[in-house]
Amino acid sequence: MNANDATLTGLATAHTGSTAGHPAPNAPAASSFDLILQAAAGSALGNSGTPYTLTISAIDLTCVTQGWPTLTLHQSFDAASGWKPSGTGQGYQCTQTFPVPVPGGGPGGPLAGHTLQCVASLISRGAWIVSIIHTNPFVLV
């Protein structure tokens, strides 16, 4: 990876507290699930403090509508935002877990049986760095 670049490398839905992706993240009867985001940054960027905006949204593919309100986070390439040196020493990595409440409070809610997909984007000021990623489609119960 270029020393001055960053990319979103993974986005998955999982049961709360799990690190393994799951196509029905609130099954069999949970009121929330986790969205796990992974990213990588080059050696010059990863601890530079450069600001960026991380936006996460959900799309209800069944009804072709917004699944729930968009999450917009103003973060920086620094330890406070979760960036740390990668195991290989060639750059930085970041893994963030976002708890997602199931709309309607849990199983049987208004999106039960719907297929959804989450999309995340990382955009630096001036759009020098832009990365977009999406989850596999998933179903809420």
Task: Go through each PLM region and give its residues.
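Extended, solvent-exposed segments with strong compositional bias
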Residues: T65-G105
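Contiguous beta-strand segments within globular domains
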Residues: H15-T53
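Internal, hydrophobic beta-strand segments that form the core of beta-sheet-rich folds
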Residues: F33-Q38, P51-D60, Y92-V139
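Amphipathic alpha-helical interaction modules
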Residues: A29-S31, N47-S81
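Intrinsically disordered, low-complexity segments enriched in small/polar residues
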Residues: L8, H15, T19, A30, ...
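Short beta-strand elements
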Residues: M1-T13, H74-A80, L116-C118, L122-V141
